[in-house]
UniProtKB/Swiss-Prot annotation:
Similarity comment: Belongs to the MacroD-type family.
Organism superkingdom: Bacteria
Classification via Gene3D superfamilies: Leucine Aminopeptidase, subunit E, domain 1
One Pfam family hit: Macro
GO molecular function: O-acetyl-ADP-ribose deacetylase activity
Protein name, as recorded: Macro domain-containing protein XAC3343
Start and end residues of each Macro domain: 1-175
InterPro entries: Macro_dom, Macro_dom-like
Originating organism: Xanthomonas axonopodis pv. citri (strain 306)
């Protein structure tokens, strides 16, 4: 079992599932959400449009997950999750972000998926501070692997050097604390 930090395009990974940092409409957007929609092809948008709305314009509330096929991606599945918009850290943002990771891992386990790739959820337009988000991502994935067998391979995908360094620093800090 391992956690890997990888810098590059999440849509290129050959894993069982990639996690999409989506918006509540699931209709595509900017950042990683737009990249995943473009790479997966038009059938992804059709699949997202077919998902029921829980209230007008909302198919996936913050912290929840919806599943689609991977379509034109190497990944077989896409887990769409909506991370919190950063306000000031006092409106349950850390708990909501942690829940995005935990619920994705729980669903991967239920589906017996062995590999999962996460983007830096909420770190783009949603404005979550990168180092805090990286610490949450590492904590949640490490805690999961301590008590679960699946998924065996977790990839934290960095879209740039700053994100890569933040993940590496969070991993190193946890390794030092665990020693």
């Amino acid at each position: 079992m391992r956690i890997e930090v990888w810098q590059g395009d999440i849509t290129e990974l050959d894993v069982d599932v990639i996690v999409n940092a989506a918006n509540e409409s699931l209709l595509g957007g900017g950042g990683v959400d737009g990249a995943i929609h473009r790479a997966a092809g038009p059938r992804l948008l059709e699949a997202c449009e077919a998902l029921p709305q829980v209230r007008p314009g909302v198919r996936c509330p913050t912290g929840e997950i919806r599943i689609t096929d991977g379509f034109d991606l190497k990944a077989r599945h896409i887990f769409h999750t909506v991370g919190p918009v950063w306000r000031d850290g006092r409106h349950n943002e850390p708990e909501q972000l942690a829940n995005c990771y935990w619920q994705s891992l729980k669903l991967a386990e239920q589906m017996m998926l062995h590999s999962i790739a996460f983007p830096a959820i909420s770190c783009g337009i949603y404005g979550y501070p990168l180092h805090q988000a990286a610490r949450i991502a590492v904590t949640e994935t490490r805690d999961w692997q301590r008590s679960h067998k699946v998924p065996k391979h977790i990839v934290l995908v960095a879209y740039n050097e700053a994100t890569y360094k933040a993940y590496q620093q969070a991993l190193a800090t946890q390794e030092t604390a665990a020693a």
